[in-house]
């Protein structure tokens, strides 16, 4: 059975687990965590400009949605306010695993909405066969932002070595003229004073979303040894 609106099968709709590959994330460019997952069924994003996008799973967010990195809980300030971003590095990752609903209790306690696990390539679980270099450059006009990224992985003397660096800086999100709606205040006792305040208020339009700027720098380095017994 396939839903015509969603173009997915019934089994896919009922499955609480979804895996998004690293190549799919790379095709999106520099995006927030919420925006990267926004296309998944049951997942949406609470955005604040282009840099901030907190994921919402089945209508739940904040402490009800737990963010993990390689299985370890990420502790940042994203839960303090809507204008705080999730401190995760989506540059050159392996995959993102999303578990929706009560099934997430199998992997983390105190979670009712779901969990999101970012799996990166810092610790290789298989031997690196060929040396791989990746370089990324990006610019965004809506916030005068730019981003650069670099990563390399290789096998040196039987050890798998990985290094990556990313740097992103985005200004305040531009807002088109006239897009801001003002709540008018009426004072029957002083109409003249109100008219003056009205003009001053609209003169203060700044043309951008305040506090939507962001900057992030991330460095990852890892070494692993793979053998028949596993990896370390």
Describe the function of each predicted region.
Residues 17, 34-76, 94:
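Extracytoplasmic beta-strand/coil segments of soluble accessory domains associated
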Residues 48-50, 86, 109, 141-145, ...:
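Transmembrane beta-barrel outer-membrane domains
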Residues 1-26, 34, 62, 120:
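Short, acidic, small-residue-rich periplasmic hinge/interaction motif at the N-terminus
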Residues 33-36, 53-56, 68, 83-88, ...:
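N-terminal periplasmic accessory domains that precede
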């Amino acid at each position: 059975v396939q839903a015509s609106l969603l173009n997915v099968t019934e089994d896919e709709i009922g499955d609480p687990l979804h895996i998004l590959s690293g190549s799919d994330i790379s095709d999106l460019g520099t995006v927030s965590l919420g925006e990267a997952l926004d296309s998944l069924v049951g997942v949406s994003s609470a955005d604040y400009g282009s840099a901030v996008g907190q994921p919402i799973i089945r209508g739940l967010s904040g402490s009800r949605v737990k963010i993990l990195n390689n299985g370890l809980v990420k502790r940042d300030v994203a839960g303090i306010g809507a204008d705080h971003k999730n401190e995760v590095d989506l540059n050159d990752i392996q995959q993102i695993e999303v578990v929706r609903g009560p099934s997430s209790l199998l992997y983390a306690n105190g979670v009712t909405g779901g969990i999101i696990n970012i799996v990166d390539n810092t610790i290789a679980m298989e031997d690196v066969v060929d040396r791989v270099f990746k370089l990324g450059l990006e610019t965004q006009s809506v916030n005068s932002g730019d981003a650069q990224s670099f990563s390399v992985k290789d096998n040196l003397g039987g050890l798998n070595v990985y290094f990556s660096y990313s740097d992103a800086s985005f200004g305040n999100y531009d807002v088109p003229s006239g897009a801001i709606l003002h709540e008018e205040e009426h004072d029957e006792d002083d109409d003249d004073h109100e008219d003056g305040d009205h003009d001053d208020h609209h003169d203060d339009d700044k043309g951008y979303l305040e506090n939507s700027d962001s900057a992030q720098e991330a460095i990852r380095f890892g070494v692993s040894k793979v053998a028949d017994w596993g990896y370390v």
